[in-house]
Amino acid sequence: MGGVLSYFRGLLGSREMRILILGLDGAGKTTILYRLQVGEVVTTIPTIGFNVEQVTYKNLKFQVWDLGGQTSIRPYWRCYYSNTDAIIYVVDSADRDRIGISKDELLYMLREEELAGAILVVLANKQDMDGCMTVAEVHHALGLENLKNRTFQIFKTSATKGEGLDQAMDWLSNTLQSRK
């Protein structure tokens, strides 16, 4: 297991937690999934459908679902919402042209009753790219300041470099632990 996964082993109870990784196509969802699972970047192709992996962080078991982000696939995200403990929403911080679409998809998803209690982790990904939006810009562009009754946090990440993922997963695990 990668460093991030072994880092979480023993932290929480043994109940399997259901995590969805969502976001537009090309945001870095699959790269993040496998960076968390094996601790390194693997070659990926666009996800048509989903990838699902079982991962263990310390004592907490995760069933992590990486759902494709193409326009034609997004309507099917709702088929996976049931019993979700947390959502990792990945944003391509370098894609200024589609940040409005990302906001619309995020807000549409968060209106779903099945996700009412799910923790939200927003990853402002691709922070290593020139001209990318800052975390504050992504926060504002997504309208996160308007979220009410939702436990959430945003993190600056670079999936390819592995930056920021430990902090995000540490916050998520601590937040899940506090709900036990």
Curated annotation (Swiss-Prot):
Name its species.
Drosophila melanogaster (Fruit fly)
Q: Which GO terms describe its cellular component?
A: cytoplasm; Golgi apparatus; presynapse; trans-Golgi network
Which Pfam family, any one of them, does this sequence belong to? Arf
Q: What does this protein do?
A: GTP-binding protein involved in protein trafficking; may modulate vesicle budding and uncoating within the Golgi apparatus.
Q: Where does GTP bind?
A: 23-30, 66-70, 125-128
The gene that this protein is the product of is Arl1
Which residues carry the N-myristoyl glycine lipidation? 2
Which molecular function GO terms apply here?
Answer: GTP binding; GTPase activity; protein domain specific binding
Question: SMART domains in the record, alphabetically?
Answer: ARF, RAB, SAR
Task: Give a yes or no for keyword Nucleotide-binding in this entry.
Answer: yes
Q: Which InterPro entries match?
A: P-loop_NTPase, Small_GTP-bd, Small_GTPase_ARF, Small_GTPase_ARF/SAR
Keyword list, A-Z:
GTP-binding, Lipoprotein, Myristate, Nucleotide-binding
What's the protein name?
Answer: ADP-ribosylation factor-like protein 1
Which terms under GO biological process does the entry name? Answer: endoplasmic reticulum membrane organization; Golgi organization; intracellular protein transport; neurotransmitter secretion; protein localization to Golgi apparatus; protein localization to Golgi membrane; regulation of cell migration; regulation of ER to Golgi vesicle-mediated transport
Spell out the SUPFAM superfamilies in the cross-references. P-loop containing nucleoside triphosphate hydrolases
Could you name the domain of life of the organism this protein comes from? Eukaryota
Question: Can you tell me which family this protein belongs to?
Answer: Belongs to the small GTPase superfamily. Arf family.
